[in-house]
């Protein structure tokens, strides 16, 4: 959501209080106080929370990715999610390594992905490294590197048959 923070917070809180949602996705960089308060509100209403961090410019160092994921868990995330923008194939390996390490140390599930074409392999093989979910598009991609859900399903079925 690209809305000013007060409008974003109000929208998320209305969704939580509506009784019609089971899961909300909050941006980590909304600020610790806002995130903590919103997570508490969500949990009081039996709504689960994905805490997300989207880096559309670069891929942070592995230690920073791990720090962010652990911070999400510390703030009460039910699921921790990070999406990064690779500048090289090495950046994709950095994300996958961080995913594997985080899956061993976090108590909550995590979702990770490296964006654009370079990062596609992370969307297809993320679960091998510890990511619990991937995203496909139905119509048009909503993020760089998403592929059609039909294609994705076929690729994942092939991977699953051979694991």
Predicted regions and their residues:
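Catalytic alpha/beta core domains of metabolic enzymes, predominantly
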Residues: 13, 28-163
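Glycine/small-residue-rich loop that forms an oxyanion/phosphate-binding "nest" at active or ligand-binding sites
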Residues: 1-33
């Amino acid at each position: 959501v690209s809305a000013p923070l007060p409008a974003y917070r109000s929208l998320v809180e209305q969704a939580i209080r509506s009784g019609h949602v089971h899961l909300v996705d909050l941006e980590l960089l909304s600020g610790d106080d806002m995130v903590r308060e919103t997570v508490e509100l969500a949990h009081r209403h039996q709504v689960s929370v994905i805490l997300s961090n989207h880096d559309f410019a670069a891929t942070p160092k592995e230690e920073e990715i791990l720090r962010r994921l652990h911070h999400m868990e510390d703030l009460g995330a039910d699921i921790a999610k990070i999406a990064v923008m690779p500048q090289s194939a090495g950046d994709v390996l950095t994300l996958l390594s961080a995913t594997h390490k985080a899956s061993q140390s976090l108590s909550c599930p995590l979702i990770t992905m490296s964006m654009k074409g370079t990062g596609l392999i992370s969307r297809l093989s993320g679960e091998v490294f510890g990511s619990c979910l991937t995203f496909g598009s139905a119509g048009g991609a909503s993020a760089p590197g998403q592929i059609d859900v039909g294609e994705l399903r076929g690729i994942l079925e092939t991977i699953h048959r051979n694991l």
